[in-house]
Amino acid sequence: MQSKRLGIVSLLACSLAVLFGISDALTADAQSPTFTVGWSAYAGWNPYFYMQKSGILKKWADKYGVSIKVQRFDYAASLDSFVAKNIDACAMTNMEALDMPAAAGVDSTAIIVGDYSNGNDAVLVRDNLTFQTLPGKPIMLVQKTVSEYLLERGMVLNGQQSQLGKLHLINTSDADIVAAFLNNKSNQAVVTWKPLVSQIVADKSVHSIFDSSKIPGEIMDLMVVRTEVLNTPNGQKFAKALTAAWYETIQQVATGQANALKYSAAASGDSIESYKEQLKTTALFVSPKSAVDFTDGSDVQKKMDLVRQFCFTHGLLGQGIHSVDDVAIAYPNGAVQGNKARVRLRFNSAYMQAAEQGKL
């Protein structure tokens, strides 16, 4: 009887401890500064879903005394939310970082360079079209995006720069582009990204004439934080927690950890096999050192110059912009492309470097 009573008392004590523990945790969460990260479905960004699902993000957020919410958006909506300052950080390409927040005057900082497209984006054709015969033919794509950038780079690298003005572009949403292209055999060319590319080339009459592996490092996938957030002590804790969580997560994805692949694939409604196929054409910077070496290298500036020139030529840097230098970019070595008084996009490798040095 005595042992049973002690058991009941012990159980009650444990229950109270659990309840008080939960209460303390809830109180701590309520008191913690909260930050929100936006992401959209893409091979290099799907791991943010797993990061949250697995508890990896919470573990690092707790270490730094912050609370981090991860919110999924359609890509365009995520950028709009970031520009409107409704979220603190957002996954986006280098081009969108320049022509959305930076062009809107929102000073932004890339703290994680996660990967670059190494074949995920492609120019696909029927009827044996080439870059020489492409001008004048209807080309389906999402205009003013990396798809149009890829198409123009393909034209230039194949000696067709003088024909750029003759391209006949059909603006088509990514939600409609696969069906619109495949269901009408008179459509001869399309530019898009995986997994849409994989769905289209399943039709054996379609093949790729150019993809992003031909322009390595030019289409980068970033985690961008508003600089005003990063300039606060809590914002820096947030950046440290997010960076640490990212590298723990991406190493699990890269090494094929079962749940990491399962949830990363599920994030975009893909099978694990389809997701693995997308990863093959995504140049992931799995180690922080590889990301730091890339970000700190002079090659990044050359690639970003191509992107900013494209954005300026197409009027993507905002109203009243009369020079490509009016929306400037700063780099980790202190170099600035453009007017130093008008820096709107910054590459900051400090957090990746801290991860490399084991200081997070």
What annotation goes with each model-predicted range?
Residues M1-L12:
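Bacterial N-terminal signal peptides that target proteins for export
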Residues S10-G21:
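Bacterial N-terminal signal peptides
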Residues I22-D29:
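Signal peptide processing junction and immediate N-terminal pro/mature segment
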Residues D29-N171, A180, Q188-K194, G217, ...:
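Short, glycine-/small- and polar/acidic-enriched structural segments
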Residues F49, L98, E152, S198, ...:
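Predominant activation on well-ordered alpha-helical scaffold segments within soluble catalytic domains
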Residues E96, Q163-I170, A175-I272:
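Pocket-lining segment of extracytoplasmic ligand-binding domains
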Residues N231-G320:
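Secondary-structure end/capping motifs
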Residues R308-L360:
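Conserved C-terminal helix/tail region of periplasmic/extracytoplasmic solute-binding proteins
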